[in-house]
């Protein structure tokens, strides 16, 4: 699976490609360039010290820096305008504040999705399908949107559907999050496909697991059954076919147990390891898969800070210990 954070970055980089904006949305490109020029002037002139807060400059390799730049200007727009007017500077004169606000609102859900998917101490794979659906809904043009934002949404939606295909594993992971077990985010055919796939996986899991009681729903003691007239013919009686995969899946679908906090999802499945023996095993196997590689990249960055040109004599175990402390303290 692709890193979802990288995919979102690629989607937005293509959506805000300068060549595309210059041809199709020149007014939007002009507004973004004006904001960038304002931030550059404030930083180079040292005037940021006279503002309530600092301003952020856009970095071409990070789409979220575009949002940070716009918000840093809009949040103190009046203060910046007064400061520039006092110096006879007209950089803000033709800035379309309404359009910039729309662009910020357009980018905000992507920021939320990226931050949630890049968490490294929380299960994130079930969130991929949910945020994908939420972003698709967000990218549906609204009657209140400006023509520029409508076109931007259309282009971004096109790239999102191409670059971020929802895989079977994403759907299974969402199914294993109890509040969304019925997969109402999918249509009926897709739901059936996920259920069929989970049944297949459970059959394989039950073959691998040692035989034994699979549920604590049954009491430890049951009174002996009364003898019936059929007992004398029991050797010829039809055997009831047991299908642990089906019964376990059906019980899970009927269950009312929930887990609103995704941070406790693995704890829930650990607590249900006897009630749902196969599903618990499957959940631990699937939910441990991260949706992004952000955590690994943060560790690589930390390693670069720890192991420097003047600090190359560290033993491998010392480097590992320092990285462990950096990660967990």
Segments the model singles out, each with a brief description of its role:
Residues 1-82, 89, 152:
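Surface-exposed, charged/polar loop-rich segments
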Residues 6, 38, 65, 70, ...:
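Mobile genetic element proteins and their domesticated derivatives, centered on retroelements
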Residues 14-17, 74-75, 84-86, 185-188, ...:
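Short coil/turn segments at secondary-structure boundaries
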Residues 47-53, 274-289:
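Short, hydrophobic/aliphatic alpha-helical segments
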Residues 58-60, 94-103, 116-126, 161-165, ...:
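Conserved, non-catalytic sequence blocks in retroelement Pol enzymes and Pol-derived host proteins
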Residues 65, 114, 173, 177-178, ...:
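Short, conserved catalytic/metal-binding micro-motifs enriched in Asp/Glu and His
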Residues 80-248:
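Extended, C-terminal/distal alpha-helical "rod" segments
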Residues 207-209, 259-260, 307-329:
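Polyampholytic, low-complexity intrinsically disordered segments
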């Amino acid at each position: 699976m692709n890193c979802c954070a990288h995919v979102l970055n690629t989607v937005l980089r293509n959506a805000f490609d300068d060549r595309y904006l210059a041809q199709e949305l020149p007014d939007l490109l002009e507004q973004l360039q004006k904001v960038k020029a304002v931030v550059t002037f404030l930083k180079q002139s040292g005037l940021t010290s006279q503002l309530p807060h600092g301003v952020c400059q856009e970095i071409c390799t990070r789409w979220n820096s575009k949002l940070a730049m716009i918000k840093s200007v809009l949040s103190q727009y009046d203060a910046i305008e007064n400061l520039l007017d006092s110096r006879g500077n007209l950089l803000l004169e033709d800035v379309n504040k309404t359009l910039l606000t729309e662009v910020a609102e357009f980018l905000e859900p992507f920021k939320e999705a990226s931050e949630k998917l890049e968490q490294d101490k929380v299960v994130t794979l079930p969130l991929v399908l949910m945020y994908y659906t939420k972003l698709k809904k967000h990218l549906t043009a609204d009657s209140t949107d400006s023509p520029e934002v409508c076109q931007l949404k259309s282009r971004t939606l096109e790239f999102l559907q191409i670059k971020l295909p929802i895989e079977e594993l994403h759907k299974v992971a969402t199914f294993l999050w109890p509040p969304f077990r019925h997969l109402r985010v999918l249509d009926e055919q897709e739901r059936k496909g996920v259920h069929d796939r989970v049944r297949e996986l459970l059959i394989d899991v039950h073959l691998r697991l040692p035989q034994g009681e699979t549920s604590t729903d049954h009491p430890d003691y049951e009174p002996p059954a009364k003898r019936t007239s059929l007992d004398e013919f029991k050797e010829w009686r039809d055997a009831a076919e047991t299908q642990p995969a089906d019964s376990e899946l059906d019980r899970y679908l009927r269950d009312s147990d929930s887990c609103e906090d995704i941070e406790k999802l693995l704890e829930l499945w650990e607590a249900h390891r006897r009630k749902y023996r196969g599903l618990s095993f499957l959940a631990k196997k699937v939910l441990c898969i991260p949706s992004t590689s952000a955590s690994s990249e943060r560790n690589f960055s930390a390693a670069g800070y720890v192991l420097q040109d003047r600090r190359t004599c560290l033993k491998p175990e010392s480097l590992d210990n320092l990285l462990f402390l950096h990660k967990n303290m």
